[in-house]
Amino acid sequence: METIVVVLMILVCFNFMMKQTFRKRGSVAAIAVVAALFVGLMCPYAIQQSKTQIADWLADAQLMLDTSVVLTVEVALQMAFCMLAVHVLTTGPVKKRTLWAYRALRWFPGILIFPVLFSGLVYLIFSFPGVSFSLVAWSMAVGVLILISVGTLFLRYLLPEKELRLELLFLTNALTAILGIIATVNGRTAVT
């Protein structure tokens, strides 16, 4: 179960980074600053977590179902962005409503990146015992700021074609949806 959650978290991070490749550098920088501030300011809440509490959360079926709903909504929005982006790229003039929906979805960075960043912060705090919690949090915040900014540029360089990035974003979101369904089952199978 924990392995599936870790793979889901990696996919959420990758999807977030891929989505940033469709935005302008200024908005990527703004999102990077927001994510870095989130990591730095979550230190007081992250130090209150315990490993047993996190294990209990992963074992809580109702919490996993609630998280799966949020994951499904985010994946649906990201896939809708991919389909609208292809529609805008391939057709001539588009309706204003379609263009408005495309722009709104392009600006939606995703909300699951924040729980993933929080989880990463908790993991780092547990990994560095004896080190100041705020030092760990703000060091991770600087790392997040640099990683989002540089990682987005690297992905644009690595995949310069917008269509290829859209296809990859769509496919990784589909994989995220499938893994979300698997994680929701949480060891319960329908055996009759």
Where are these regions (language model features)?
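Alpha-helical transmembrane segments of polytopic membrane proteins
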Residues: 1-8, 32-33, 65-80, 134-145
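N-terminal signal-anchor/start-transfer transmembrane helix
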Residues: 3-24
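Alpha-helical transmembrane segments and their helix-start/interface "positive-inside/aromatic belt" motifs
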Residues: 18-36, 159-171
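Hydrophobic alpha-helical transmembrane segments in multi-pass integral membrane proteins
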Residues: 43-50, 116-122, 176-192
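Alpha-helical transmembrane-segment detector that highlights a single hydrophobic TM helix
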Residues: 50-88
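C-terminal transmembrane helix-loop-helix hairpin of multi-pass membrane proteins
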Residues: 135, 151-192
